[in-house]
């Protein structure tokens, strides 16, 4: 049975009897049925937020889950009825999906583009309300009902409520239509004798709330997983920081210990400073002062004279006997120089004898350093 003027009047009466907002208008998603319960029924889904609107397939699925289909407008009277619903919403700019779509078949030469469109709910109605230059039959396959109150009229007049083919991935509002049969309220009986409640239709608003809850739940689980990873790594990070700091301190101390002390370096110099050369407090002077005259003159049998022998001119340059020998005292003519007395073992600095052959160059190479042997 096609909706006629009588049905339009009934639906408008039902619309007036339905719950309304404080402004007295139809609510988005409100179910409007003939007589309040009889079908066909309609739901006009309008979103103020454009980001919440759906593409064609999403709108079709939302209607299907709610027990209906995208609306099939089969007569001009039904077209006017849908227009009244939308006007009563006081909706702003935003087109509405309807259940008309172009078939995915190759166009035959003698087939008009308009003839390739069919209703998704299986209706065979040939009623169309295209705008003057529509459909364009390009990449735009799905169909919307124009709703642009702010748009100026085009070359074919006002765009309002005219049909236009559009890309199926565009985001729009939509209209659902429910079957002509009376909805069943009697619970079904299972084979085991248990009664089951009829399925509760899922509204688009409820679906969005469920999707929001699922998204929030997934985000929370991801945050917990991240926390489970980061919390155990905090002690390891602190241990790494402490270990690095300890190693740095140890290396600094090691380098500081390896660096020579400037005061110690000055004490190890070979030549004493001029002030130290003339100082009467040197250890050697203190030792000499403690020696008595008897220590310097009396012999000591337990000590040997330590002598250096100067090489003669006949000896070869590499003769090791020219270096030094610890031998008994020889006459001064033999070329030995007595450095220590038998008594004290200190240098007397009295005798420096050289061989006659080396007298000529004694100033250059014959000098014997005074050493102290105790």
UniProtKB/Swiss-Prot annotation:
Q: Which segments sit on the Cytoplasmic face?
A: 243-374
A single GO molecular function term of this UniProt record: carbohydrate binding
User: What's noted about domains in the record?
Assistant: The C-terminal domain interacts with the N-terminal domain of RDX.
The regions listed as transmembrane in this protein's record are 222-242
**Any one GO biological process:** positive regulation of axonogenesis
Residue ranges, Extracellular compartment? 25-221
* Chief place where the protein resides: membrane
What are the start and end residues of every segment in region (Interaction with TLN1)? 330-374
The record's gene field reads: LAYN
Question: Which tissues is this chain's protein expressed in?
Answer: Widely expressed. Abundant in the ovary.
Disulfide pairs here are: 63-176, 142-168
Q: Which organism is it from?
A: Cricetulus griseus
Domain (C-type lectin): residue spans on this chain? 37-177
> Can you say what this protein is called?
Layilin
Q: Which GO terms describe its cellular component?
A: cell surface; cytoplasm; membrane; ruffle
**What InterPro entries does UniProt report for this protein, alphabetically?**
C-type_lectin-like, C-type_lectin-like/link_sf, C-type_lectin_domain, CTDL_fold
Outline the segment boundaries, as ranges, of region: 3 X 5 AA repeats of E-S-G-X-V. 333-368
Spans of repeat sequence: 333-337, 343-347, 349-352, 364-368, 370-373
Intracellular or extracellular location(s): Membrane
């Amino acid at each position: 049975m096609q909706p006629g003027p009588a049905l339009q009047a009934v639906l408008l009466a039902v619309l007036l009897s339905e719950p309304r907002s404080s402004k007295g208008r139809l609510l988005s998603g409100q179910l409007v049925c003939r007589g309040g319960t009889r079908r066909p029924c309609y739901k006009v889904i309008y979103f103020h937020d454009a980001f919440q609107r759906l593409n064609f397939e999403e709108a079709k699925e939302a209607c299907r889950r709610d027990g209906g289909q995208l609306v099939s407008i089969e007569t001009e009277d039904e077209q006017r009825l849908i227009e009244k619903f939308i006007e009563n919403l006081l909706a702003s700019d935003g087109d509405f999906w309807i259940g008309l779509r172009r078939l995915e078949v190759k166009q035959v030469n003698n087939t008009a583009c308009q003839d390739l469109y069919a209703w998704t709910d299986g209706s065979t109605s040939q009623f169309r309300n295209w705008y003057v230059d529509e459909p364009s039959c390009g990449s735009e396959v799905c169909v919307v009902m124009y709703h642009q109150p702010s748009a100026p009229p085009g070359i074919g007049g006002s765009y309002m409520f005219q049909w236009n083919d559009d890309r199926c991935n565009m985001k729009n509002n939509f209209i659902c239509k429910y079957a002509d049969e009376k909805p069943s309220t009697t619970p079904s009986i299972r084979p085991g004798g248990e009664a089951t409640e009829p399925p509760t239709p899922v509204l688009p608003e409820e679906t969005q709330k469920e999707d929001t809850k699922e998204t929030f739940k997934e985000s929370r689980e991801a945050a917990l997983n991240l926390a489970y990873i980061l919390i155990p790594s905090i002690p390891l990070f602190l241990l790494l920081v402490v270990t690095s700091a300890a190693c740095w301190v140890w290396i600094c101390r090691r380098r500081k210990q390896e660096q020579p002390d400037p005061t110690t370096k000055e004490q190890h110099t070979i030549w004493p400073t001029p002030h130290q050369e003339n100082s009467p407090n040197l250890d050697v002077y203190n030792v000499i002062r403690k020696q008595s005259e008897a220590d310097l003159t009396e012999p000591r049998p337990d000590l040997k004279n330590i002598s250096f022998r100067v090489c003669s001119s006949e000896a070869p340059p590499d003769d090791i006997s020219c270096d030094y020998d610890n031998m008994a005292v020889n006459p001064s003519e033999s070329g030995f120089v007595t450095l220590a007395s038998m008594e004290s073992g200190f240098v007397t600095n009295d005798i420096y004898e050289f061989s006659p052959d080396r007298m000529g160059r004694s100033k250059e190479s014959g000098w014997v350093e005074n050493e102290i042997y105790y």
